[in-house]
Amino acid sequence: VPARRAGVIDNPYLEWIGADIRCDPWAYAAPGWPERAAEMAYRDAYLSHRRNGVYGAMFFAAAISAAFVLEDPLDAVGIGLTEIPAECRLAKDIRWALGKTKSLSGWQEARALVDGRFQGMHAVHTNNNACLTVFGLALGCLLYTSPSPRDS
C-alpha cells in the first residue's frame, strides 16, 4: 500500500487527535516559525489522518511554534488559525471558542459549552479537543494574570 493511501484504509480515526499528539516536535524544531512547523506537521499527519485530523496537527504545531515568541497564548491560537483553511470545520469551531472566552466563568461552563456544541462527537475528536484547549488557555491566562488573593 502506498504511504499516501495507508492512512485511509480501514481507519475510522481520520479526524481524531492522534496527529495532534504528535505535532509538538515540529513546533520545537521551528520555534517562532509557525509556517514551517505547520508544514512539517502536515507531512506527518497525512500519513494517518485527513481533513480536520490533519488541520488540527497543523494548527497546534503553528500555535506552539508561535508561542515561543508571543506573550499571550491566545495570540498564538490566532497564528495557528492562519495555517489552516479558514472555512474548514476546525477553524470555524476554534473561532467559536475564541468568541466565548471573554464571558467564560470557569471550567464547568467551558465543558458544558463543548458538550452542547459537539453532542455525539467522540471524546478524542480533533474539533472538540481544540475548543477545550482554547478554553483552557483562556482560563489559564485569567488565573495567571489576575491578582492572587495572597497579594491582597
Identify the meaning behind each predicted range.
Residues V1-E71, D75-E87, W96-L98, G116-G120, ...:
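Amphipathic alpha-helical interface segments
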Residues Y144-D151:
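Conserved small/polar residues in nucleotide/adenosyl-binding loops
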